[in-house]
Amino acid sequence: MLAGPAMSQTTPTPDPVLAGYRASIDNIDAALIHILAERFRITKAVGAYKAQTNLPPSDPGREERQIARLRKLAEDANLDPEFSEKFLRFIIEEVIRHHEQAQGTR
């Protein structure tokens, strides 16, 4: 009797080096999520404060300074500054959206 394709396949032996890398990535991903959650807890408080004090939801000057600062940090860390800027702009847009919701302007 001939073995079909499903019969001849075996489960590959896990590569311990790759498994170690993946475990590190999983830990870093978890840390990123917790850090983002903390960041959003703080920006939520900022949004509430801005709503109470009638400050605008966004601060373009602050945002541009943050982007410039993080681009420099990215360069120093050998991380693509373009990627870092896109990532931060995405976060800023979400924060502004939350601030607008806190003020009832969106």
For the regions a protein language model found, what residue spans apply to each?
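Domain-level signature for soluble enzymes in the chorismate/prephenate branch of the shikimate pathway
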Residues: 2-106
